[in-house]
UniProtKB/Swiss-Prot annotation:
CDD domains: GT_MraY
GO molecular function, one term: phosphotransferase activity, for other substituted phosphate groups
Keywords per UniProt: Cell cycle, Cell division, Cell membrane, Cell shape, Cell wall biogenesis/degradation, Magnesium, Membrane, Metal-binding, Peptidoglycan synthesis, Transferase, Transmembrane, Transmembrane helix
Reactions the enzyme catalyzes: UDP-N-acetyl-alpha-D-muramoyl-L-alanyl-gamma-D-glutamyl-L-lysyl-D-alanyl-D-alanine + di-trans,octa-cis-undecaprenyl phosphate = Mur2Ac(oyl-L-Ala-gamma-D-Glu-L-Lys-D-Ala-D-Ala)-di-trans,octa-cis-undecaprenyl diphosphate + UMP
Lineage: Bacteria, Bacillati, Bacillota, Bacilli, Lactobacillales
Protein's recorded name: Phospho-N-acetylmuramoyl-pentapeptide-transferase
Principal EC category: transferase
Localisation per UniProt entry: Cell membrane
Enzyme Commission (EC) number: 2.7.8.13
Sequence intervals crossing the membrane: 3-23, 51-71, 79-99, 115-135, 138-158, 169-189, 195-215, 221-243, 306-326
GO term, biological process aspect, one: regulation of cell shape
Membrane topology classification: Multi-pass membrane protein
């Protein structure tokens, strides 16, 4: 436990030092920052804010987790595969950000390219991680999927990678939402005695807390796709490594809600010839524009943050209660 906590502290300190250096480099190199293409007027002031800051907490977390696990004899197949997903999905996000920032391609990677790279990572993860017989745990009951587990694994990794990416639209929202989710998985890992996975979790929590100091409202830096895609993939990988896949539907309710809102909006828009359910999706923008109803007073970014963090925290506590108190 001491090793895991130490890893989190080291990552926190390294990120705390690394982010200001990253921002300074960004400014000196006169790199064009985040472009704003949203209809939320208050976001227009954010144009030019340095992005790709997720690169800092990703590098520090992966390196610290790797070396701490290696030198404490806690490096395992599961640790290796979680770090692999972080690196590969981080590279996908980096390429996406690179095309947007340096090549001025607003779309970045097109959907097919991004999906292909994410699926590739999912296939490699499936082939090498310790699966335990391709068994899916559904509320504690084993479901034998056999060969079909690979389709679940791909759906899980790609789905939650993109879901966290959608959540990253308000200052600080995604970073602390993921911290809350990781805390819940840290408890599960500790109870299961999987200290190797706990080490990776605490290393990333440290990195995200260090990043949040510069990412809260008003954000001095954004994590970019390099951070959000990696974090979503990590959560999915951890839920599978702990054989508690179903828990991510509750622990990750914020990401599920954000993604579902987009799917509902697009489907309803097509079916009704242009009508909308929400003012704007992902749904955090709906709250920004008009509160819960969409027709009330706009919510500040802090209010949106605390609402979603509260939902995520309650969902995480509910999951732990279901697992260990019922």
């Amino acid at each position: 436990m001491f090793i895991s906590i130490s890893a989190g502290i080291v990552t926190f300190l390294l990120t705390l030092v690394g982010i200001p250096a990253f921002i300074q480099f960004y400014r000196k190199a006169q790199i064009t920052g985040q472009q704003m293409h949203e209809d939320v007027k208050q976001h227009q002031a954010k144009a030019g804010t340095p992005t790709m800051g997720g690169l800092v907490f990703l590098i520090t977390s992966v390196l610290v987790a790797f070396f701490f696990a290696l030198f404490s004899s806690q490096f395992s197949n599961n640790v290796g595969m979680i770090l692999f997903i972080l690196v590969l999905y981080g590279l996908v996000g980096f390429l996406d950000d690179f095309l947007k920032v340096f090549r001025k391609i607003n779309e970045g990677l097109n959907p097919k390219q991004k999906l292909a790279l994410q699926l590739l990572g999912g296939v490699i993860f499936y082939l090498f991680y310790e699966r335990g017989g391709d068994i899916l745990s559904v509320f504690g009951y084993p479901v034998h999927l056999g060969f079909f587990y690979i389709f679940f694994a791909l759906f899980w990794l790609v789905g939650f990678s993109n879901a966290v990416n959608l959540t990253d639209g308000v200052d600080g929202l995604a970073s602390i939402s993921v911290v809350i989710s990781l805390f819940a998985y840290g408890v599960i890992a500790y109870v299961q005695g999987q200290m190797d996975i706990l080490l990776v979790i605490l290393a990333m929590i440290g990195g995200l807390l260090g990043f949040f100091i510069f990412n809260h409202k008003p954000a001095k830096v954004f994590m970019g796709d390099v951070g959000s895609l990696a974090l979503g993939g990590m959560l999915a990988a951890i839920s599978m490594a702990l054989h508690q896949e179903w828990t991510l539907l509750i622990i990750g309710i914020v990401y599920v809600f954000e993604t579902t809102s987009v799917m509902m909006q697009v489907s309803y828009f097509k079916l009704t010839g242009g009508k909308r359910i929400f003012r704007m999706t992902p749904v955090h923008h709906h709250f920004e524009l008009g509160g819960l109803s969409g027709k009330g007073n706009p919510w500040s970014e802090w209010k949106v943050d605390f609402f979603f963090w509260g939902v995520g925290l309650l969902a995480s506590l509910l999951t732990l209660a279901i697992l260990y108190l019922m």
